[in-house]
Amino acid sequence: MLGIIGGTGLTKLPGLSVTHRQVIRTPYGEPAGPLTFGELDGHPVAFLARHGYGHTIPPHLVNYRANIWALQSQGVSHVVSVGTVGGIHPQLGPGKFCVPDQIIDYTHGRESTFAKYDGKPVVHEDFTWPYCQEMRLRCIAALHRAQEDFFDGGVYAAVQGPRLETKAEIDRLARDGADMVGMTGMPEAYLAREISLCYATVAVSVNWAAGRGDSAEAITAEMIEATLANVVDRLYSVLKHLACMDYDQELPVTPGGICDV
């Protein structure tokens, strides 16, 4: 089953025919809210609002472990994480979709592993490619089917938040190779890897990062909300195309290729 994690601007899923909501108790505390189960265009999905259904949980206080564990415990095998980002790359202006393929983690102090380190041998999980390639290709196929012009690949810089960045910080991220900046990409992606969820991100650029675009323009909540209002219907179309895919069978994936979904 497909799990959808909604970020800023997606605290509910338009068009979802809800069957039930369920509060999941986890060994890691409470998730951001109950899981919402239903059908999207006739296909089963589970939806979770990352920041809570009232958008009350800031990125550095999200219980990422509980969120990811809750989805997996209910039979979710594949996860698309929807997140807003600031565009650093010149092609990632407001309103542009992106399917990143790399992450640089600048966060700190977040619970970032399910491991207990209770005397058992330490396991070092490979994270060379932080996103599930199969799920990335599904996202790419869905964006093509929705006739979206999108950015394929790119480096997601995961920062602590909740404040936005300074121009100097964005300049540093750009020198490090980042194409976009967001606050929720880690440890979410790694936790999904630890428990074998096939996870990828569809990022939505809602503003130019500080100093990009019109560098004199301040980043305001109104600016971000206006962009979100313009992309919600487009995002819903992408998610419908994702929901209609078969998640009971693992797809053969060729690096750099589009699988038949």
Show which residues each predicted segment covers.
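Non-catalytic positions within long, well-ordered alpha-helices that form the structural scaffold/packing
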Residues: 72-75, 174, 193
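Metabolite-binding pocket within alpha/beta catalytic cores that recognizes anionic/polar moieties
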Residues: 1-128
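Active-site rim beta-loop-alpha module in soluble metabolic enzymes
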Residues: 130-174
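His/Asp/Glu-rich mid-to-C-terminal helical/loop segments that flank catalytic regions of hydrolases
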Residues: 210-261
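Short acidic/polar active-site loop segments enriched in Thr and Asp
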Residues: 77-78, 179, 198
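Zn-dependent metallopeptidase/amidohydrolase metal-coordination segment
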Residues: 183-221
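Generic hydrophobic/aromatic pocket-lining and core-packing "Φ" positions
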Residues: 68, 170, 186-189
